[in-house]
Regions:
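Structured-RNA-binding interfaces characteristic of tRNA pseudouridine synthases
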Residues: 1-287
């Protein structure tokens, strides 16, 4: 299905769809990958394309149901995902198995949103509320020209970065800290203390000019990964010092840390759940 065809059926009424209804709903968990370049983030917004809205309308097309798809968290416009989770409840009788949901959704979704796996989960499972951690990857392009193949998939810095200096700075950020200085001015989170479990920085196995920063934490503030990335880049450029980062963690001063890196370099890499709650086959998890 082309994007034009998808937009056409999105605007149609689905009130005439006839379906059988089960007495109780089944909770389904989706593992998704998507290119966020043409979407305004996850959450439904009036009259603009979002990932959540596209999924909900796809399910409505298949079953006639109006459902809410719960995502593992909000994403900004342009953010991508290699592994993102979302769940929804369905009472439709015409799609009863995970295999059928997998085939049906991939048949109607636009080609920049793909369902990688589907599994049934307990009725009280929620993709965001049950998560105990998340892992993100940020991609930086250091080559001196902006390649058309990485233009909307990475941040083009256009200069060589000192990865050793960046790794030393990352050590300061690891552990439990108040990350007030590393969040958007619009962030409304009441809990600004987060626990960064791991930060790794290295070059891509596929392209030497691509630098990958991976960050795992119990949860994140709005723009936190992007501001950490901007800070690590500016430390490599000698625009920010280690002392500035330490001060920012102590006093929450946003002016002491780096810029907010562009959204299009950010990828949702993994949503972490308690052992045994979600079991994805290893072959479907991208690294």
């Amino acid at each position: 299905m082309t994007r034009q065809e998808f937009a056409h059926w999105q605007n149609k009424q689905t009130n005439n769809v006839s379906i059988d209804i089960l007495p109780s709903a089944q909770n389904w968990l989706l593992l998704l990958t998507f290119d966020g370049a043409f979407y305004h983030g996850w959450q439904v917004q009036p009259d603009i394309p979002t990932i959540q809205d596209t999924l909900q309308k796809s399910i409505q097309r298949l079953t006639g149901e109006t459902v809410r798809v719960n995502g593992a968290g909000r994403t900004d416009s342009g953010v991508h995902a290699l592994n993102y989770t979302a769940n929804f409840n369905s009472t439709a009788k015409n799609i009863l198995t995970a295999e059928k949901w997998y085939s049906a959704l991939n048949a109607v979704l636009p080609d920049d949103i793909v369902v990688k796996y589907v599994q049934s989960v307990p009725a009280d499972f929620h993709a965001r509320h049950n998560a105990i951690g998340k892992r993100y990857r940020y991609m930086i392009c250091s080559q001196n020209y902006n390649s058309p193949f990485t233009k909307n998939k990475s941040w083009h810095v256009g200069q060589t970065l000192d990865l050793d200096i960046m790794r030393q700075a990352a050590e300061i950020l690891k552990g439990k800290h108040d990350f007030s200085a590393f969040r958007s001015s619009n962030c409304s989170s009441l809990n600004t203390v987060k626990d960064i479990r791991e930060i790794s920085i290295g070059k891509s196995h596929f392209q030497n000019s691509i630098i990958q920063i991976e960050i795992e934490a119990n949860s994140f503030l709005q723009h936190m990964v992007r501001i950490i990335t901007g800070t690590l880049v500016e430390i490599s450029q000698a625009r920010i010092s280690f002392a500035d980062v330490k001060k920012a963690l102590n006093n929450g001063d946003r002016n002491l840390v780096g810029c907010t890196a562009p959204a299009h370099g950010l990828y949702s890499l993994k949503v972490i759940y308690p052992d045994g709650l979600v079991n994805w086959p290893k072959k479907v998890i991208d690294n």
